[in-house]
């Protein structure tokens, strides 16, 4: 990592530390402590990704080969694409569809990081980006959209390594559009965990994307307030839902 990239990462972390309350700092520090600087990708662009937060969830590199073979196993259901776009097939359940469209499975591809898995990740994301935009349904549910934004930001090093400029621009346009939609629908998001997920996604976006920097202060404040409101003194959620 070059000196300028290290400065950019440190600056972003410093901003988040200054603006966030203790609860919010804990959440973001865990994810950004091992963040990856992305400034080396197309330096100088004002719409570029600066850092990628660390994904702390468990990974299984063997699942990358299943996905490459077109087998998508989520929520106890298996769908095989047989060469078709997985996004065009009928989902076997809403939970399966939510897992697919949350893009959390990208972390398994990153665990098996290779030229093949990177190309596979880009191909699948391109499939999603190329779909006609029809807002509504599971893919545009607040909690699913928030998970997708977080996953795409976290797995940007996998997706953008070896990518050409055209894919980079498509990826960023789509990501920015989804972030904008999250901000627009914020007032309608139900209370509880979904609202918290959306605020975390928006805070990540403001810290990771150069074109979202103007939202750092408001996103950080809203996340800090929501964490203070929803988290109990013992660290549990007020719903007591594990």
Give the ranges of each region predicted by the language model.
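Extreme N-terminal leader/anchor segments
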Residues: 1-82
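A near-ubiquitous, low-amplitude feature marking generic local secondary-structure context
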Residues: 3-10, 14, 88, 92, ...
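Long, acidic, intrinsically disordered low-complexity segments
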Residues: 37-63, 77-111, 191-208
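Short clusters of hydrophobic/aromatic residues that line enzyme substrate/ligand-binding pockets
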Residues: 72, 87, 237
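Aromatic-lined, polymer-binding surfaces characteristic
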Residues: 94-242
């Amino acid at each position: 990592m070059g000196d300028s990239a290290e400065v950019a990462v440190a600056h972003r972390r410093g901003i988040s530390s200054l603006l966030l309350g203790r609860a919010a700092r804990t959440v973001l520090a865990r994810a950004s402590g091992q963040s990856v600087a992305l400034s080396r990708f197309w330096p100088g662009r004002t719409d570029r990704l600066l850092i990628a937060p660390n994904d702390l969830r468990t990974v299984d590199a063997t699942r990358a080969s299943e996905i490459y073979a077109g087998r998508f196993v989520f929520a106890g259901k298996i769908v095989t694409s047989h060469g078709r776009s997985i996004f065009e097939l009928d989902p076997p359940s809403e939970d399966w569809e939510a897992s697919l469209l949350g893009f959390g499975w990208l972390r398994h591809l990153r665990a098996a990081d290779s030229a093949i898995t990177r190309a596979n990740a880009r191909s699948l994301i391109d499939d999603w980006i190329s779909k006609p935009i029809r807002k509504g349904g599971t893919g545009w549910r607040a909690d699913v959209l928030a998970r997708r934004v977080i996953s795409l930001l976290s797995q940007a090093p996998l997706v953008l390594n070896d990518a050409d400029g055209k894919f980079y621009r498509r990826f960023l346009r789509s990501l920015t559009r989804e972030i904008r939609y999250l901000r627009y629908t914020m007032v309608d998001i139900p209370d509880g965990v979904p609202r918290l997920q959306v605020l975390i996604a928006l805070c990540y976006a403001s810290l990771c994307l150069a074109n979202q920097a103007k939202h750092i202060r408001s996103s950080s404040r809203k996340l800090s307030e929501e964490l203070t409101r929803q988290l109990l003194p013992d660290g549990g959620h007020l719903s007591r839902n594990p």
